[in-house]
Amino acid sequence: MSPSGFYAWRTRPESARTQEDRRLKVLMHASFTGGRGYYGSPRIQDDFLEWGEHVSRKRIIRLMQEEGLQARVRKRYKVTTDSDHDQPIADNLLQQDFTADRPNQRWVGDTSELRIGENGKAYLAVILDLYSRFVVGWAISAVNDRHLTIKALEMALKRRCPGLGLLHHSDQGSTYASEDYQDVLAAYGITCSMSRRGNCYDNAVMEAFFSTVKSEIGEWFASHGDAKAELFDYIEVFYNQRRRHSAAGRMSPAAYERRLTHAA
Protein backbone atom coordinates (compact mmCIF):
# COMPACT_ATOMS: atom_id res chain seq x y z
CA MET A 1 0.00 0.00 0.00
CA SER A 2 1.30 3.45 -0.90
CA PRO A 3 1.87 6.09 1.80
CA SER A 4 -1.07 8.10 0.50
CA GLY A 5 -3.30 5.02 0.51
CA PHE A 6 -2.28 4.13 4.06
CA TYR A 7 -2.97 7.68 5.22
CA ALA A 8 -6.38 7.63 3.56
CA TRP A 9 -7.18 4.32 5.30
CA ARG A 10 -6.09 5.66 8.69
CA THR A 11 -8.03 8.91 8.41
CA ARG A 12 -11.27 7.64 6.89
CA PRO A 13 -14.39 8.15 9.05
CA GLU A 14 -15.61 5.26 11.18
CA SER A 15 -18.60 3.42 9.83
CA ALA A 16 -21.94 3.95 11.54
CA ARG A 17 -21.87 0.36 12.82
CA THR A 18 -18.42 0.81 14.37
CA GLN A 19 -19.60 3.97 16.11
CA GLU A 20 -22.69 2.14 17.35
CA ASP A 21 -20.57 -0.77 18.61
CA ARG A 22 -18.44 1.66 20.59
CA ARG A 23 -21.53 3.26 22.14
CA LEU A 24 -23.00 -0.14 23.00
CA LYS A 25 -19.74 -1.24 24.59
CA VAL A 26 -20.00 1.64 27.05
CA LEU A 27 -23.49 0.49 28.02
CA MET A 28 -22.36 -3.13 28.10
CA HIS A 29 -19.57 -2.31 30.55
CA ALA A 30 -22.07 -0.42 32.70
CA SER A 31 -24.33 -3.48 32.79
CA PHE A 32 -21.45 -5.87 33.45
CA THR A 33 -20.11 -3.66 36.25
CA GLY A 34 -23.58 -3.15 37.71
CA GLY A 35 -23.96 -6.92 37.70
CA ARG A 36 -20.66 -7.17 39.58
CA GLY A 37 -19.08 -9.13 36.75
CA TYR A 38 -21.64 -11.93 37.08
CA TYR A 39 -23.81 -11.08 34.07
CA GLY A 40 -23.61 -12.95 30.79
CA SER A 41 -25.27 -11.96 27.53
CA PRO A 42 -28.87 -12.81 28.61
CA ARG A 43 -28.91 -10.44 31.59
CA ILE A 44 -26.95 -7.76 29.74
CA GLN A 45 -29.59 -7.94 27.03
CA ASP A 46 -32.24 -7.50 29.74
CA ASP A 47 -30.50 -4.32 30.90
CA PHE A 48 -30.34 -3.09 27.32
CA LEU A 49 -34.08 -3.64 26.87
CA GLU A 50 -34.79 -1.78 30.11
CA TRP A 51 -32.71 1.10 28.75
CA GLY A 52 -34.62 1.09 25.45
CA GLU A 53 -31.81 -0.55 23.47
CA HIS A 54 -32.88 -3.42 21.21
CA VAL A 55 -29.70 -5.40 20.61
CA SER A 56 -29.49 -9.02 19.52
CA ARG A 57 -27.91 -11.62 21.80
CA LYS A 58 -25.49 -12.51 19.02
CA ARG A 59 -24.20 -8.95 18.84
CA ILE A 60 -23.82 -8.74 22.61
CA ILE A 61 -21.82 -11.96 22.64
CA ARG A 62 -19.53 -10.56 19.94
CA LEU A 63 -19.04 -7.30 21.83
CA MET A 64 -18.34 -9.18 25.07
CA GLN A 65 -15.72 -11.29 23.32
CA GLU A 66 -14.08 -8.20 21.85
CA GLU A 67 -13.92 -6.64 25.34
CA GLY A 68 -12.83 -9.84 27.09
CA LEU A 69 -15.92 -9.99 29.31
CA GLN A 70 -17.05 -13.40 30.54
CA ALA A 71 -19.50 -14.38 33.28
CA ARG A 72 -18.34 -16.85 35.89
CA VAL A 73 -19.19 -20.55 35.63
CA ARG A 74 -21.65 -21.98 38.13
CA LYS A 75 -20.35 -24.53 40.64
CA ARG A 76 -22.10 -27.33 42.49
CA TYR A 77 -22.45 -26.85 46.21
CA LYS A 78 -21.40 -29.31 48.90
CA VAL A 79 -24.23 -31.29 50.45
CA THR A 80 -24.49 -30.93 54.24
CA THR A 81 -27.59 -33.04 54.88
CA ASP A 82 -27.61 -35.37 57.88
CA SER A 83 -30.55 -37.70 57.27
CA ASP A 84 -29.49 -40.33 59.81
CA HIS A 85 -31.80 -39.44 62.69
CA ASP A 86 -34.96 -40.67 64.38
CA GLN A 87 -37.08 -37.56 63.89
CA PRO A 88 -40.35 -37.80 61.92
CA ILE A 89 -40.09 -37.10 58.19
CA ALA A 90 -42.76 -35.06 56.39
CA ASP A 91 -44.22 -36.09 53.05
CA ASN A 92 -42.93 -34.49 49.87
CA LEU A 93 -45.85 -32.14 49.24
CA LEU A 94 -43.94 -29.81 46.94
CA GLN A 95 -43.39 -32.54 44.33
CA GLN A 96 -40.78 -30.48 42.45
CA ASP A 97 -43.36 -27.79 41.65
CA PHE A 98 -41.18 -24.73 42.17
CA THR A 99 -43.86 -22.20 41.27
CA ALA A 100 -46.03 -19.93 43.39
CA ASP A 101 -48.89 -17.56 42.61
CA ARG A 102 -48.06 -15.08 45.33
CA PRO A 103 -45.43 -14.30 47.96
CA ASN A 104 -45.44 -16.41 51.13
CA GLN A 105 -47.14 -19.34 49.45
CA ARG A 106 -44.11 -21.64 49.19
CA TRP A 107 -40.73 -21.33 50.86
CA VAL A 108 -37.73 -23.61 50.35
CA GLY A 109 -34.77 -23.92 52.68
CA ASP A 110 -31.37 -25.56 52.72
CA THR A 111 -27.88 -25.28 54.21
CA SER A 112 -24.49 -25.22 52.50
CA GLU A 113 -20.91 -25.44 53.70
CA LEU A 114 -18.38 -22.61 53.29
CA ARG A 115 -14.61 -22.61 53.83
CA ILE A 116 -13.07 -20.23 56.37
CA GLY A 117 -9.36 -19.47 56.55
CA GLU A 118 -6.96 -22.38 56.07
CA ASN A 119 -8.94 -25.20 57.67
CA GLY A 120 -12.13 -23.70 59.06
CA LYS A 121 -15.74 -24.15 58.02
CA ALA A 122 -18.97 -22.22 58.27
CA TYR A 123 -22.52 -23.05 57.33
CA LEU A 124 -25.01 -20.87 55.50
CA ALA A 125 -28.73 -21.55 55.97
CA VAL A 126 -31.10 -19.85 53.53
CA ILE A 127 -34.85 -19.66 52.94
CA LEU A 128 -36.14 -18.57 49.52
CA ASP A 129 -39.64 -17.53 48.51
CA LEU A 130 -40.50 -19.49 45.36
CA TYR A 131 -42.71 -16.69 44.03
CA SER A 132 -39.83 -14.31 43.35
CA ARG A 133 -36.73 -16.22 44.58
CA PHE A 134 -36.34 -13.50 47.22
CA VAL A 135 -34.07 -14.56 50.09
CA VAL A 136 -36.46 -14.07 52.99
CA GLY A 137 -34.17 -15.49 55.66
CA TRP A 138 -30.55 -16.49 56.10
CA ALA A 139 -28.01 -17.14 58.83
CA ILE A 140 -24.37 -18.18 59.10
CA SER A 141 -22.68 -20.15 61.87
CA ALA A 142 -19.59 -22.22 62.59
CA VAL A 143 -21.92 -25.06 63.64
CA ASN A 144 -24.51 -26.77 61.45
CA ASP A 145 -27.27 -27.33 63.97
CA ARG A 146 -30.94 -26.55 64.57
CA HIS A 147 -30.06 -23.15 66.04
CA LEU A 148 -28.66 -22.10 62.65
CA THR A 149 -31.73 -23.11 60.64
CA ILE A 150 -34.10 -21.69 63.24
CA LYS A 151 -32.26 -18.36 63.08
CA ALA A 152 -32.78 -18.22 59.30
CA LEU A 153 -36.43 -19.19 59.75
CA GLU A 154 -36.97 -16.52 62.40
CA MET A 155 -35.53 -13.87 60.08
CA ALA A 156 -37.95 -14.98 57.37
CA LEU A 157 -40.93 -14.91 59.73
CA LYS A 158 -40.03 -11.46 61.07
CA ARG A 159 -39.44 -10.06 57.59
CA ARG A 160 -42.55 -11.49 55.91
CA CYS A 161 -45.16 -12.12 58.63
CA PRO A 162 -46.79 -14.86 56.51
CA GLY A 163 -50.44 -15.78 56.90
CA LEU A 164 -51.92 -19.25 56.92
CA GLY A 165 -51.39 -21.54 53.94
CA LEU A 166 -47.60 -21.32 53.70
CA LEU A 167 -45.73 -24.48 52.65
CA HIS A 168 -42.13 -24.88 53.85
CA HIS A 169 -39.97 -27.39 51.96
CA SER A 170 -36.52 -28.67 52.90
CA ASP A 171 -34.46 -31.85 52.84
CA GLN A 172 -34.73 -34.51 55.54
CA GLY A 173 -31.77 -33.16 57.50
CA SER A 174 -31.81 -33.34 61.27
CA THR A 175 -31.68 -29.55 61.58
CA TYR A 176 -35.02 -29.25 59.75
CA ALA A 177 -36.62 -32.38 61.21
CA SER A 178 -35.69 -31.39 64.77
CA GLU A 179 -38.49 -30.93 67.27
CA ASP A 180 -37.50 -27.31 67.89
CA TYR A 181 -37.63 -26.39 64.20
CA GLN A 182 -40.92 -28.19 63.70
CA ASP A 183 -42.37 -26.42 66.74
CA VAL A 184 -41.66 -23.04 65.15
CA LEU A 185 -43.36 -24.13 61.91
CA ALA A 186 -46.38 -25.41 63.83
CA ALA A 187 -46.64 -22.23 65.90
CA TYR A 188 -47.09 -20.22 62.70
CA GLY A 189 -49.41 -22.73 61.03
CA ILE A 190 -46.83 -23.57 58.37
CA THR A 191 -47.13 -26.90 56.57
CA CYS A 192 -43.91 -28.90 56.34
CA SER A 193 -42.74 -30.72 53.20
CA MET A 194 -39.51 -32.68 52.79
CA SER A 195 -37.53 -34.05 49.86
CA ARG A 196 -37.18 -37.75 49.31
CA ARG A 197 -34.03 -39.15 50.84
CA GLY A 198 -30.97 -38.51 48.67
CA ASN A 199 -32.94 -36.80 45.87
CA CYS A 200 -31.34 -33.41 45.16
CA TYR A 201 -33.88 -32.66 42.42
CA ASP A 202 -36.64 -32.34 45.02
CA ASN A 203 -34.98 -29.13 46.21
CA ALA A 204 -33.27 -28.10 42.97
CA VAL A 205 -34.00 -24.40 43.44
CA MET A 206 -31.87 -24.28 46.56
CA GLU A 207 -29.07 -26.22 44.90
CA ALA A 208 -29.14 -23.69 42.05
CA PHE A 209 -29.08 -20.79 44.51
CA PHE A 210 -26.03 -22.03 46.37
CA SER A 211 -24.27 -22.80 43.10
CA THR A 212 -24.92 -19.22 42.02
CA VAL A 213 -23.61 -17.80 45.29
CA LYS A 214 -20.41 -19.82 45.14
CA SER A 215 -19.75 -19.03 41.50
CA GLU A 216 -20.30 -15.32 42.00
CA ILE A 217 -18.64 -14.57 45.35
CA GLY A 218 -16.81 -17.83 46.01
CA GLU A 219 -16.97 -20.28 48.90
CA TRP A 220 -13.76 -19.26 50.74
CA PHE A 221 -13.58 -16.39 53.21
CA ALA A 222 -10.74 -15.13 55.38
CA SER A 223 -12.82 -15.15 58.57
CA HIS A 224 -16.36 -15.65 59.85
CA GLY A 225 -16.70 -11.88 60.06
CA ASP A 226 -15.68 -11.46 56.44
CA ALA A 227 -18.07 -14.20 55.37
CA LYS A 228 -21.01 -12.57 57.15
CA ALA A 229 -20.21 -9.12 55.75
CA GLU A 230 -19.75 -10.35 52.18
CA LEU A 231 -22.87 -12.49 52.31
CA PHE A 232 -24.92 -9.59 53.66
CA ASP A 233 -23.73 -7.39 50.81
CA TYR A 234 -24.36 -10.10 48.22
CA ILE A 235 -27.76 -11.25 49.48
CA GLU A 236 -29.38 -8.07 50.79
CA VAL A 237 -27.81 -5.43 48.55
CA PHE A 238 -27.23 -7.28 45.29
CA TYR A 239 -29.18 -10.55 44.97
CA ASN A 240 -32.53 -9.46 46.39
CA GLN A 241 -32.49 -5.89 45.08
CA ARG A 242 -30.55 -5.91 41.81
CA ARG A 243 -29.69 -9.34 40.41
CA ARG A 244 -31.95 -10.35 37.56
CA HIS A 245 -33.51 -13.82 37.85
CA SER A 246 -34.99 -15.87 35.03
CA ALA A 247 -37.75 -17.18 37.34
CA ALA A 248 -38.70 -13.61 38.28
CA GLY A 249 -39.45 -12.35 34.80
CA ARG A 250 -35.78 -11.38 34.27
CA MET A 251 -36.19 -8.85 37.08
CA SER A 252 -34.64 -8.76 40.53
CA PRO A 253 -36.70 -10.53 43.23
CA ALA A 254 -37.56 -7.20 44.86
CA ALA A 255 -38.61 -5.62 41.55
CA TYR A 256 -40.74 -8.65 40.72
CA GLU A 257 -42.61 -8.36 44.00
CA ARG A 258 -43.06 -4.60 43.57
CA ARG A 259 -44.67 -5.32 40.20
CA LEU A 260 -47.31 -7.38 41.98
CA THR A 261 -47.93 -4.57 44.47
CA HIS A 262 -48.34 -1.98 41.71
CA ALA A 263 -50.70 -4.27 39.79
CA ALA A 264 -52.91 -4.59 42.86
Question: Model segments located where?
Answer:
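Charged DNA-binding/catalytic regions of mobile-element recombinases
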Residues: 1-264
